[in-house]
């Protein structure tokens, strides 16, 4: 049995999963957390399930939060029919709280909106990448909106200019600083250009 995060922010897994493909997957139950992929990557935001299924593991289970890509307070589990039926019979499943009906109703009725937002997100990611003078300072994955880096001076500069990013020490206060820029569909063209301009200014210094 192998457990993994589909999006590990280092590029080791998604999109090609090179290391995973070296394993004897026909003998392995593969369990993947796709919380950072569902709604963003894959055809129509379907995540990595079909990609991982194409590797033909002995069994595939994909779980995810719907809160990141879809903004729904709930979760999902995808897998082979027999496994899902088995999970449905457990006390863990029976005692779990479902997503709020209003959230699920909105989710089901919003396919067109999600599609439009993914197009905007794709364009925003391209605008960000194309505008940077030093893209190699970032660790990122194709078509994914997260860009990690290790320059504390950049984080300080952005904060001073009222640009907020993910920036904290994890998993404890003695750990290395985790800095990550997340592009979203809510960002306007001017937002991306402003961010790029500040990052490029740092590159020149």
Feature-to-residue mapping (PLM):
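Basic, amphipathic juxtamembrane/active-site segments
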Residues: 43-55
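Conserved PLP-binding catalytic core of the aspartate aminotransferase-like
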Residues: 120-162, 179, 185
């Amino acid at each position: 049995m192998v457990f993994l995060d589909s999006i590990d922010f280092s590029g080791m897994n998604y999109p090609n999963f090179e290391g995973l493909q070296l394993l004897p997957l026909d003998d392995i139950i593969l369990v993947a957390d796709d919380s950072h992929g569902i709604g963003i990557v894959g055809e129509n935001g379907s995540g990595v399930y079909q990609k991982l299924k194409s590797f033909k593991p002995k069994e595939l289970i994909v779980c995810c939060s719907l809160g990141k890509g879809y903004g729904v307070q709930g979760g999902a589990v995808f897998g082979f029919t027999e496994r899902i039926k088995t999970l449905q019979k457990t006390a863990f499943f029976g005692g779990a709280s479902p997503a709020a009906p209003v959230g699920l109703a909105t989710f089901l009725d919003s396919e067109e909106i999600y599609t439009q937002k993914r197009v905007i997100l794709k364009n925003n990611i391209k605008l960000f990448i194309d505008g940077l003078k030093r893209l190699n300072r970032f660790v990122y994955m194709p078509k994914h909106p997260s860009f990690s880096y290790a320059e504390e001076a950049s984080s300080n500069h952005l904060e001073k200019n009222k640009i907020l990013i993910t920036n904290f020490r994890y998993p404890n206060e003695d750990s290395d600083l985790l800095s990550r820029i997340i592009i979203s569909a809510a960002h306007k063209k001017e937002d991306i250009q402003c961010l790029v301009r500040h990052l490029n200014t740092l590159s020149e210094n």
